[in-house]
């Protein structure tokens, strides 16, 4: 009995101390805007690039073209492009990562 209690405690301790491995799959997240205004984006934000002049309030997040952010009132909602647009049309979204 005592041996099983010690094993359970040891197992729980190891489980709690072990850091979880980050998932390789990207997920959605939110970014709050300091000035609560979407109209002056991406001024002052080098990490945001407008996708296209015809696609208002949508920005590439970061250096690549995997994450898309949508400016919604006082926050940015950022998701992988496949989640945002769907896998059937996400490949036609223009990406200029220069």
UniProtKB/Swiss-Prot annotation:
Glycans are attached at residue 72. Pfam families: SCRG1. One of its GO terms (cellular component) is cytoplasm. It is found in: Secreted. GO terms for biological process: mesenchymal stem cell proliferation. InterPro entries: SCRG1 (IPR028063). Its main location: secreted. Residues 1-20 form the signal peptide. Keywords: Glycoprotein, Secreted, Signal. Belongs to the SCRG1 family. This is Scrapie-responsive protein 1. It comes from Mus musculus.
């Amino acid at each position: 009995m005592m041996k099983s209690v010690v094993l359970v405690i040891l197992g729980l301790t190891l489980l709690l101390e072990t850091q979880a491995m980050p998932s390789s799959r990207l997920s959605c997240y939110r970014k709050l805007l300091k000035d609560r205004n979407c109209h002056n984006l991406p001024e002052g934000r080098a990490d945001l690039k407008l996708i296209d002049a015809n696609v208002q309030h949508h920005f590439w997040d970061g250096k690549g073209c995997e994450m898309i952010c949508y400016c919604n009132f006082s926050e940015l909602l950022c998701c992988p492009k496949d989640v945002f647009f769907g896998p059937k049309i996400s490949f036609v979204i223009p990406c200029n990562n220069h």
